[in-house]
Structure formats: structure tokens, C-alpha cells
Amino acid sequence: MNLAEDFENVSMYFEHKCLNVDFENTQLTFQTNMGKKTESYSSIIGSDGAFSALRMAMQTSGRFNFSQDYLPHGYKELNIPPKSGQAQMDINSLHIWPRGEFMLIALPNPDNTFTCTLFLPFEGVDGFDNLKGDDEVIRFFQKYFSDAQDLMPNLLDEFKSNPTSNLVTVRCYPWVKEKVALMGDASHAIVPFYGQGMNSSFEDCVILDDMMEKYLPNWDKVFDAYQEERKPNADAIADLALQNFIEMRDLVGDKDFLYQKKIEHRLCSLYPEQFKSQYELVTFSNQPYHEALNKGQHNTELVQKIIKENLEHKIEERDFMESFLAQRDL
């Protein structure tokens, strides 16, 4: 917003809640502090979140595909404070307590605190619905996260006062209707397990800007090219995030999975030009998400082949392994 203030042709209106979009008459209706207000538009780029009013208007206009899938899990944020000003765990690590169907994670903050998130089913014996009293909460943490509990002096107060939130994946298509386009969570809300929600929305901005450079003043071409480029990648990062939830809560505690990851890391280290992990492609490159998803699947197949054929001892034999990796790309 600070940058936008330098442009005289940009106006900002606060306390304007979008209520409806009239596509036929190209009008928007807002709820303001002074009552309802209707404005005409020439084009709209809607980034109004996972429960988008603009998307809702598109849903009711017909020929619009939409799905909203909730995980059976919710999440609650907790806190590990510093002790005598010092962090109580390694500040250069993501800490995970995998427990199969649920998990606790902790992320470091600059002030030496850790933001912890408990991902837990709503229902079941070990579900949020059964953790209502102090005794139940204490027993649960003593059973599953006793070492983390020792670092949480405010556990009970935070557990009772902090909300339990939902985890939802939103998919829809088309993102475009006439002079209107959806962007960000409004078009592709995802669960947080790859840490890519904000980044995927920023990628929307980059691609839309590219298409504006190519096709303006033809907004139809801009919007069509934008959604054609972004839709497959939005679906891919949604799938990747769901896959990573299973990996984080369950697979990181499986010895076979960890052995596969050990081989994968070795390949990444020895052959960085030929082998990049899915995580590296998603997090540290501009590789489109759908390509990263496909390459990750190929990587898994390749590592499993190495294990099945007992080729681990050949990983450092450069001629053999470079040839082996090259065959993957044929």
C-alpha cells in the first residue's frame, strides 16, 4: 500500500465489504459504514480470500465448478517462550513431533520464542472434541508430547483461549468471467503444509503482470492466458500441500522413508545439475508447481529403483550414476 500511494490513479477504500457482483450490469455492491453502495466497474481482480464474495457470485451465475474440502483435522497455535532470554530449542530448525494421525510442530521466531501448531483430528479419542478440560489436555500432552510440554508454561491458558481453526482446500474453475478474474485464496486456497500459500498468490501476481505486458489493452486475452498458466500450478501445490501433511505427521517417523530421503539427499549433493529434490524445486526455484510435482514423483520412483536393485554402493560412481540419471529423462 505504501508503494501504491505514489500513484495518483490508485485509490484505496477501507471498510468496504463486497456483498454482490452484477455481471450483466457490471456493478459491485458494498457494505460500508454509511450503508450499501453500488459502483460500476470496467474490470475486477478479486483477491478477497478463501471465502470470496466475488467467487460466490460467480458460483451462482452458472457453469462454474467449485469444491471446498475440509480436512478432518483442525489446528491450534501454542507458544514456547524463551528461558532467561534464550531459545529453548535450536532456532535453525523446524521441529516436528510426528504421531501418525496428528502432529505438533514448532517454528522459531526472531525473539527466541517458538510458534507451535497442534494439528489434530476434531473427532476421536485423541481429538479436539475430547480435550475440553484441563485434566484431558494435560494427560494428552504428557502421553504424546511430554518433552514439548515441559517447555510450555502457559499451555493450559493458551489451549483454552486460542481458537481451533479449520483446514480447507478450495478449487474452482473458471477463474475468469467476462471482465472479472479471481486471484490468490479466492481461486485456490490450500492447507499450510508446504508453506506456499502466500507465495502461490504472489506467483499469480507475477503471471498476471506478465500477461498484462503481453496483451493489454485486451483484458479478455490477459485473463484467459493468466488462468491457463496458473490453474494447473494451483492444483499442483494443493496436492503437494496435502501430500506433505502425511509426510510430516507420519512418514518422517518411518525408517524406510528416512532411508529413501538419505539417498535423495546424497544424490542432490553429488549431482546437483541432474537431481533436485521436490522440496528444493518447490521452495528454492521458480520451477512451476506442476513440474515440481511430476519430478518429485519421478525422483521417488528412481530412489526406490536404486534400493530395489541394491545400487546404493554405486551412488558415488559418477559415470554410472550420471548415465543412470540421464535415462530417467528419456
Locate each region found by the language model.
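N-terminal Rossmann-like dinucleotide/flavin-binding domain of flavoprotein oxidoreductases
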Residues: 1-11
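Surface-exposed helix-capping loop/turn segments at secondary-structure junctions
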Residues: 8-10, 149-152, 216-217
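Conserved FAD-binding catalytic core of PHBH/FMO-like flavoproteins
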Residues: 5, 16-20, 25-167, 171-172, ...
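C-terminal helical "tail/cap" subdomain of flavin- and related membrane-associated enzymes
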Residues: 210-330
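A structural signal for well-ordered alpha-helical segments within the folded catalytic domains
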Residues: 52, 135, 203-206, 257, ...
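Conserved mid-domain beta->alpha element of the FAD-binding
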Residues: 45, 78, 161-253
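Non-transmembrane alpha-helical segments in soluble domains
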Residues: 1, 138-142, 227, 264
